[in-house]
Amino acid sequence: MLKANRLSIYAIGKIKKKWIREGINQYKKRMPDLIINESKSFNIDNIRVNNIIICLTEEGKSFSSTELTSLLLNFKNKKINFLIGDADGIPSDIKDKSHLLLSLSPLTFPHELARLILVEQIYRVISISNGSPYHRA
């Protein structure tokens, strides 16, 4: 079973669009333990060495929601950190240190919208792992 307290999002920049911020806040109410860190740049040294690092990038691998659930469950009790870059993406040196490059879709999304989609998918993954009826395949 996945819990939000094992998952963190590290993102470059703050959400400027009110409707996206409101959407993220709706999911945060359902997952108050989910940590979302917004900053001007990534400091990979602040992420513990034994944590799993997943970079969201267009060249990453795509998964269905159930496949992503299985993948995250395989990380057992490790903390999982999702990294989302700004409009320029994630620097290659950080991608090189990640455990997985993840693509949300073959479509390209603005980074703010990608953050909302990721938060929804995290909620969905937690719901799937808990047997909640939220996800209907």
From Swiss-Prot:
The keyword S-adenosyl-L-methionine applies. GO terms for cellular component: cytoplasm. InterPro entries: Alpha/beta_knot_MTases, RasGAP_dom, RlmH-like, tRNA_m1G_MTases_N. SUPFAM superfamilies: alpha/beta knot. GO terms for molecular function: rRNA (pseudouridine-N3-)-methyltransferase activity. It holds the Pfam family SPOUT_MTase. Keywords: Cytoplasm, Methyltransferase, rRNA processing, S-adenosyl-L-methionine, Transferase. S-adenosyl-L-methionine binds at L56, G85, L104, S105, P106, L107, T108, F109. It is found in: Cytoplasm. Its main location: cytoplasm. It catalyses: pseudouridine(1915) in 23S rRNA + S-adenosyl-L-methionine = N(3)-methylpseudouridine(1915) in 23S rRNA + S-adenosyl-L-homocysteine + H(+). Its EC number is 2.1.1.177. HAMAP family: 23SrRNA_methyltr_H. Belongs to the RNA methyltransferase RlmH family. Specifically methylates the pseudouridine at position 1915 (m3Psi1915) in 23S rRNA. Homodimer. This is Ribosomal RNA large subunit methyltransferase H. It comes from Prochlorococcus marinus (strain MIT 9515).
